Every structure is written in C-alpha cells, then in structure tokens.
Amino acid sequence: INLASLSEAHGEGVRPLHGHFAKLSCIAPLERGASGLQVFTQDWRVTRKIEADLRKLEQEYIIEVRGETTPQALERLARGATRNDRELPKAKASWQNETHLRLALKNPQPGQISELCAYLRLEVRGMRRIRLGGVSMGKLPLGQWRYLASTERF
C-alpha cells in the first residue's frame, strides 16, 4: 500500500499523508489463494471492533469454478449440509454466470470455501472476496486501495 496505488475512485476529502502508511496491520485476512478486499488499519480500536465482530460479519466471495451442480444443492447450503461427517457452514450461494459462483457466509475458516465447492462438485479455479460486512470493493481495480468512506460501516 502506497500513495501511488490510491484509487481514482477515492475522492472523499481525506488527504493521504505518509504517516497513514506506517504500522498498518491487516485484519480479517484472506483465505489462502484468494484475492480481493482486505482491511488495513493503524487504529487499535478498529482492529478490536472488527476482530470482535468477525464471527458475525458476512463475507461475500466470487469463486471461479469448473463443473456443474444442481439448484437443490445450492439451496441445501443455505440450510446447512454435511460432507465427510463434518458440518459445513450455512452459506447463501447463487450463480453470477456460468463459471462464477457468488457465495456469502459468516466467519469462513481456512479451507471451508473450497470444501463447500467440493460439496457442490465444483472445482475452484480462483476466488475473490468482494464484501466484508457492509463494506464492498465496488469497482476498485486490482492492486488499488481507498479510504473507508464516512458512510460505510462493517
């Protein structure tokens, strides 16, 4: 994160200062192999708040997959399903297009998104987090960042 990668979409009156880039910590890290929305802060209060609420915050992913599944299997995810005698987390799933699955769930643990896709008999080719709670990436280009708008809340 640096001044050069600040998105042009940012325009809300926060003037970037060099001190804004010191001692940043990443909260709510991405699943291994995923890209997309990450949250960085210097404020310990923000860190504490998000870490305390992380279990309740819904996270939304767009997953590039290969394969086909049934609408009934997608509906089963919303009620909860089991795979290999393990309970899978409840998740809202829908097709964005033929190769991209939209998945929304709370507090995904490492490997759970891949496991949900395996339950659906889909092969994961890539995944991107697009939303964390009430904060969405919107049309933010890859590799760019922006400040949190004053109207946004996790």
How should each PLM-predicted stretch be described?
Residues 1-154:
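Basic, flexible Lys/Arg- and Gly-enriched helix-loop patches that mediate nucleic-acid binding at interfaces
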